[in-house]
Amino acid sequence: MTSNSDGSSTSPVEKPITGDVETNEPTKPIRRLSTPSPEQDQEGDFDEEDDDDKFSVSTSTPTPTITKTKDSSDTSTVTRRKQPIRYIENKTRRHVTFSKRRHGIMKKAYELSVLTGANILLLILANSGLVYTFTTPKLEPVVREDEGKSLIRACINASDTPDATDTSPAQEQSPAN
């Protein structure tokens, strides 16, 4: 604040900061991640002139590959490229990925039950032996009661290959004509 010769005070006018503070040059517009529209080329042209990637900082977790494409109006868009699904060797990274994906699949199960009214029972068995569950209220007794718990234990402890008694023709039912 400054005071005038008549004793009144004035406050400086605040201007919004635009551009680089030190050089006062305008900054580049922010690019947002987006998926290409069906009309755009899915392969995309790589922007050779953009050198923003040379200042990137490496992180402990790998980020998805980002492809820069140009559309007909010369504005560049950034799209994500799908990473191949393979076993994660790093134990810490594997645990973090498991936790995030477990949370994501439970969120999807909840959304599916709310949107469609479906009854859902989701069991996730971790390598550590812990069982994570998501149930809608109607199926909750399957997880909470002793009979349901014993059924879940039997399924978890069962072998991966079907028994010979399970595939006998006498137990198979054919549709009535």
UniProtKB/Swiss-Prot annotation:
SMART domains to which the protein is assigned, alphabetical: MADS
Entry keyword annotation includes Zinc: no
GO biological process: arginine metabolic process; positive regulation of transcription by RNA polymerase II; regulation of arginine biosynthetic process; regulation of arginine catabolic process; regulation of arginine metabolic process
GO cellular component, one term: RNA polymerase II transcription regulator complex
Region annotated Disordered, chain positions: 1-82, 157-177
GO molecular function, a single term: RNA polymerase II cis-regulatory region sequence-specific DNA binding
Annotated keywords: Arginine metabolism, DNA-binding, Nucleus, Transcription, Transcription regulation
Acidic residues compositional bias, start-end: 40-53
Effect after changing A109T: Decreases the physical interaction with ARG82
Comp. bias (Polar residues): 1-12, 158-177
The keyword DNA-binding belongs to this UniProt entry's keyword annotation: yes
Localization: Nucleus
Pfam families per UniProt: SRF-TF (PF00319)
Main location: nucleus
Bias-annotated ranges (Low complexity): 56-67
Record note on what altering G148D does: Decreases the physical interaction with ARG82
Domain MADS-box: 80-134
Record note on what altering L115H does: Decreases the physical interaction with ARG82
Entry-linked PANTHER family: SERUM RESPONSE FACTOR HOMOLOG
Function: With ARG81, ARG82 and MCM1, coordinates the expression of arginine anabolic and catabolic genes in response to arginine.
The protein's assembly and partners: Interacts with ARG81 and ARG82.
Descriptive protein name: Arginine metabolism regulation protein I
Species lineage: Eukaryota, Fungi, Dikarya, Ascomycota, Saccharomycotina
